[in-house]
Amino acid sequence: MVLNVYCCFFQISDIQTMKINQTILKEFILVGFSVYPHVQTFLFVVFFCLYLLTLAGNLIIMGLTWVDRSLHTPMYLFLSALSFSETCYTLTIVPKMLEDLLAKDRSISVTGCSLQMCFFLGLGGTNCIILTLMGYDRFLAICNPLRYPLLMTNIVCGQLVASACTAGFFISLTETALIFRDSFCRPNLVKHFFCHMLAVIRLSCIDSNHTEFIITLISVSGLLGTLLLIILTDVFIISTVLRIPSAEGKQKAFTTCASHLTVVIIHFGFASIVYLKPEASGDDTLIAVPYTVITPFLSPIIFSLRNKDMKNAFRRMMGNTVALKK
C-alpha cells in the first residue's frame, strides 16, 4: 500500500514536470554570439560593414540592370534576380543578428522564428535554383548560339525565375511545417544566431530524429540535385569551348563562366558543410557565418569585377550623373 502511494506520488510529479516543460512556448532565446562576450562589439562592426557592402553591391547590380538597356538580356536578368534574392536573404538574417549583438534581450517569438526560417530556406533554395538557371543560360548561349535567342527570351527568363521562387518556397514551407507541427520544450534556447532548422528541431518535446532525417534529406537532395545539374552543364560548356578555334573566343567564353563557377563553388561549398560535417564537430554558429554573411557579400563583387558590360554600364551611369550635376 505504502509502495503504491509512493509510486503514484512520483508519477504525478513526473506528469507535472512534463506539463511544465511542454508549456506552449511563445518565444525562443537566440544564444548566438553571447558565448563570445569579449568580441561582440568587434563582430558587430565587422558584420555591419559587410552588411552595408552587401546591400550596396546587390543594389548597384539591380540598378544598373534596370537603367541600362544594354543589360536587358537573360544573362543579366538572372544576375539581377539573384542579387534581389540575396538582398532579401541578407535582410532575413543579418539585421536581427546585429540587434542581438548589442542587446541583452535576444528573444524572438515563435511566429517570428517560423517566418525567419521559412524565408531563409525559401530564399536559399531560390538562390540555388537561380544559380542552376544561370548555368543553363550559359550552356544555351555557348553550346547553341544560333538557337539561343529563340530558346532564352526575357519572357522565358522571367518565367524561370518565377518557377525558381515557387519551388524554393514550396520546399521551405514543407520543411517549416514539418518542424513547427510539434510542440517545443524548455529550455527555449536556440543555440544559433538565427532560427536555423536543425537548432530549432532539437527543442522538440518528442523524439526529433525522424523529422531531422527528413529535413536533412530534403535539403541535401536539393543541394546535390542543383549542383549536379550545374556540373553537367559546365562539362558541356567546357567541351564546347575547347573546340572554339580562336584564342579570343575561348577567353571570352571562359571569362563568362569563371565568375559563375566561382560563386557556385563558394555557395555550395559553404552550404554543404552544414549537412556533411559530423554532428559533434565545430560550432554551428561559426560555421553558419560564411554562407549567411560572407557568400552574399562576395557574390556581387565576383560577378562585377571581371564583367566588362557591368563596368561599362557603371561608367556610363557615373558619367550621366556627373553631366546632370553640371
UniProtKB/Swiss-Prot annotation:
The record, for InterPro entries, names: GPCR_Rhodpsn (IPR000276), GPCR_Rhodpsn_7TM (IPR017452), Olfact_rcpt (IPR000725)
Residue ranges crossing the lipid bilayer per the database entry: 42-62, 71-91, 116-136, 156-176, 214-233, 254-274, 285-305
Q: Where are glycans found on this sequence?
A: N21, N209
Q: Which Pfam families match?
A: 7tm_4
Main localization of the protein?
A: membrane
Q: Keywords on this record? A: Cell membrane, Disulfide bond, G-protein coupled receptor, Glycoprotein, Membrane, Olfaction, Receptor, Sensory transduction, Transducer, Transmembrane, Transmembrane helix
- Which cysteine-cysteine pairs are annotated as disulfide bonds in the entry? C113-C205
> What does UniProt give as GO cellular component?
plasma membrane
Where it sits in the cell: the answer is: Cell membrane
Name one molecular function that GO assigns to this entry. G protein-coupled receptor activity
Which ranges make up the Cytoplasmic topological domains here? 63-70, 137-155, 234-253, 306-326
Bilayer topology reads: Multi-pass membrane protein
Q: Which residues lie on this side of the membrane: Extracellular?
A: 1-41, 92-115, 177-213, 275-284
Q: What does this protein do?
A: Odorant receptor.
Question: Could you say which protein family the record assigns here?
Answer: Belongs to the G-protein coupled receptor 1 family.
What name does the UniProt record give this protein? Olfactory receptor 10X1
The organism of origin for this protein = Homo sapiens (Human)
